[in-house]
């Protein structure tokens, strides 16, 4: 799931997400809309994401799902928008519960901050945070420092081992939501591996 160029439609402009402020709306509905837009909206038919290097990613459907009911999406997979929205809500709830259970500080974050972290985990998987090798991100979230969290999230912009502009754009948009600012002009600060997180 990336925000790189979708083969079947044009790429979204990052400033389109400026209007989202999860504090002003119901958390679940706004988080669903935020993620849906980052994923290119609802897609009834399976599609493949075109990576920056021209290769095609996995088959995807709905709101950026590569798996439905534990099975990989194929060109024959079907889904309704109602089904897709329910899967998206279930996934958001699962991610939210995971962070509440494993990172107590998460419960003290603002709705915008939670929405940004959920979007990140929806895109990368919660395992990116949990594996021991990713100590910078894990410690940043466990510590609750906003700058360390967004900088650590910003390290995850590769697809297939190569930098992906769509993922860089997505991390930028998530960072701006986390900081409750617009999506323009934010640049990640690189974190050295030996930084004491």
Residue map of PLM features:
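Substrate-binding/active-site groove segments that recognize
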Residues: 49-76, 92-96
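Surface-exposed patches in mature extracellular/periplasmic domains of secreted proteins
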Residues: 43-48, 100-114, 152, 186-191
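Alpha-helical segment that forms one wall of the substrate-binding/catalytic cleft
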Residues: 73-105, 110-131, 146
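Short, functionally critical alpha-helical segments immediately adjacent to catalytic or ligand/cofactor-binding
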Residues: 29-41, 114-122
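Export/targeting segments at the very N-terminus of extracytoplasmic proteins
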Residues: 2-37, 85, 89-108
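Long, amphipathic alpha-helical surface segments
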Residues: 3-17, 30, 41, 68, ...
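Second-shell loop/turn segments in exported
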Residues: 16-22, 72-86, 102-107, 135-140, ...
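Residue-level detector of buried hydrophobic side-chain packing
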Residues: 35, 61, 117-118, 149, ...
């Amino acid at each position: 799931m990336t925000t790189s160029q979708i083969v079947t439609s044009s790429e979204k402009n990052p400033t389109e997400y400026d209007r989202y402020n999860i504090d002003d709306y119901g958390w679940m509905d706004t988080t669903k809309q935020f993620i849906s837009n980052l994923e290119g909206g609802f897609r009834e038919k399976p599609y493949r994401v075109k990576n920056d290097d021209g290769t095609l990613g996995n088959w995807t459907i709905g709101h950026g799902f590569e798996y439905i009911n534990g099975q990989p999406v194929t060109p024959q997979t079907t889904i309704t928008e109602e089904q897709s929205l329910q899967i998206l809500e279930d996934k958001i709830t699962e991610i939210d519960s995971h962070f509440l259970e494993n990172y107590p500080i998460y419960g003290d974050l603002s709705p915008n901050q939670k929405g940004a972290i959920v979007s990140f985990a929806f895109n990368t998987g919660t395992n990116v945070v949990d594996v021991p090798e990713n100590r910078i991100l894990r410690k940043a979230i466990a510590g609750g420092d906003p700058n360390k969290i967004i900088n650590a999230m910003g390290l995850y912009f590769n697809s297939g081992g190569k930098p992906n502009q769509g993922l860089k754009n997505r991390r930028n948009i998530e960072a701006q939501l986390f900081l409750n600012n617009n999506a323009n002009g934010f640049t990640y600060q690189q974190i050295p591996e030996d930084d004491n997180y």
